[in-house]
Amino acid sequence: MTSDKHLFVLIHGLWGNYTHMESMRTILSTTLKKEDVNDDMIYFLPKQNAMFKTFDGIEIIGYRTLIEVCEFIRDYKDGKITKLSVMGYSQGGLVARFMIGKMLTEFKELFEDIEPQLFITMATPHLGVEFYNPTGIAYKSALYSALRTLGSTILGKSGREMFIANSSNNILVKLSQGEYLEALSLFKWRIAFANVKNDRTVAFYTAFITDCDPFIDFDNKLKYTFEEKIPGSGYKGILPKIVDLNALNVNSHAPTKPTKTYKKWGRTILIILVATFLILPIALVMNGLGTAYSYIVTCKYRKMLSNGILHNEVRGKLGLTEQLKGYVTDAYGSIINSALDMDANYEASNSNLVNEEELPWKEFIQKYTTINDGVWKSKFKKLPFDENRKVILRNLNKLKWIRVPIYIKAVNAHGVIVARRGMDENTAATGIACIEFTAQLLAYLMHKSN
């Protein structure tokens, strides 16, 4: 006799592919099995939105992902799927929010007997992407202006949507309303992980869903205070470094690093020169080509979206008309390899910490469900949000979230938060600890839900 199953969908981010979520799946599977909640778990990593396809905009990416999930559920024969959890990494968190909105409305008959459980985002720009410069440093203002223009241009429809460039690219506002917000509210738990530093793609405030960012406010010079008692056990290396926001002190700055040697300066300058004159031009050309190609091949689907008929087409045979299926199966080709990711890591200190006194999960969850109303916010200025971001923030804050401010010591914390390049001896220990903590938190919540 087959048992009821819990489907866990893991969705990758911009410029990525499904392998970016393999490390997370591995740790989840191992941890949940150890906690006796893995027997009925099945994991699904959508594969049809790789590389340039992530430029196509949230709606088209979301429909493609929904098609894959629908087909998987339709064809699954080893039991009845009765529960659903979703994890989205970076842009994948936005795609996930679109997907569940359509899943529980336009495809309600397929999902009406499936109970939403956990919804998790890892470094997701819920409030879009915007660069703020409260310190007023002139070169940063010029740099941010250039990055804003580039980001909303060379990243295709997705880039314009991330920056909420205009009223025709306001999908992030829509995702905070109506069917999307209602679907999100049906999940028993919503969890948002946010990097406090070293994430050059998604700033803390937008991943944490807040209008206050101490790390931008003080140009990342604040001294961090970490939670001393971390729930969970069996961490292989160090404990995860979760920042105690309420303990941040505006008068306590991180110690200044010693002056670099000439050798280190030379190496840094060499890296900058290589990035500026070799990697950046290649990336710009490839992104430009990807943007152009994305615009051409998705034009007809955008017309279907604007005419309100795409969802009807998708519904046919679980969403596969010949036109759309042709697009879903069309391959752009991977012409940029992972070497351009530049995801070098540093080893963290304190590699043999022992979690001698565990903080009960209940206490941790209570604190970090209400952390956005904590005393820390009174110490720092509000960011100057435009009206769109104010609306998104207000709507998303109607729901309860467990928000985790995580510190990862790595050059590219954005990639390491899910170990998207895999886990080996070179993976930052703080990144592995973050993934282990995530898995243990989810295991506890699943136990609690049961």
Curated annotation (Swiss-Prot):
Sequence motif Lipase-specific GXSXG motif, residues: 88-92
UniProtKB keywords = Hydrolase, Lipid degradation, Lipid droplet, Lipid metabolism, Membrane, Transmembrane, Transmembrane helix
Q: Main site of residence? A: other
In the induction comment, the record states: Expression is up-regulated by the transcription factor RPN4.
Report which reactions are catalysed by this protein. a 1,2-diacyl-sn-glycero-3-phosphoethanolamine + H2O = a 1-acyl-sn-glycero-3-phosphoethanolamine + a fatty acid + H(+); a 1-acyl-sn-glycero-3-phosphoethanolamine + H2O = sn-glycero-3-phosphoethanolamine + a fatty acid + H(+); a 1,2-diacyl-sn-glycero-3-phosphate + H2O = a 1-acyl-sn-glycero-3-phosphate + a fatty acid + H(+); a 1,2-diacyl-sn-glycero-3-phosphocholine + H2O = a 1-acyl-sn-glycero-3-phosphocholine + a fatty acid + H(+)
A single Pfam family it belongs to is DUF676
- State the deletion phenotype: Leads to an altered morphology of lipid droplets with a smaller size.
Q: Which GO terms describe its cellular component?
A: endoplasmic reticulum; lipid droplet; membrane
Keyword Ubl conjugation assigned: no
State the active site: S90
Q: What is the effect of changing G88A?
A: Completely abolishes the phospholipase activity
- Example of a GO biological process term: lipid catabolic process
Location(s), subcellular: Lipid droplet; Membrane
What EC number(s) has UniProt assigned to this enzyme? 3.1.-.-, 3.1.1.4
Membrane topology annotation: Single-pass membrane protein
Membrane-spanning residues where? 269-289
Molecular-function GO term, any one = monoacylglycerol lipase activity
For this protein, the record's PANTHER family field holds: LIPASE ROG1-RELATED-RELATED, LIPID DROPLET PHOSPHOLIPASE 1
Functional note: Phospholipase involved in maintaining the lipid droplet morphology. Has phospholipase activity with broad substrate specificity, acting on glycerophospholipids phosphatidylethanolamine (PE), phosphatidic acid (PA), phosphatidycholine (PC) and phosphatidylserine (PS), primarily at sn-2 position. It can later remove fatty acids from the sn-1 position of the produced lysophospholipids such as lysophosphatidylethanolamine (LPE). Also shows activity toward phosphatidylglycerol, but, in contrast to what was observed with the other phospholipids tested, prefers the sn-1 position.
Instruction: Mention any additional remark.
Output: Present with 1210 molecules/cell in log phase SD medium.
Q: Which family does it belong to?
A: Belongs to the putative lipase ROG1 family.
What's the protein name?
Lipid droplet phospholipase 1
Q: Gene encoding it?
A: LPL1
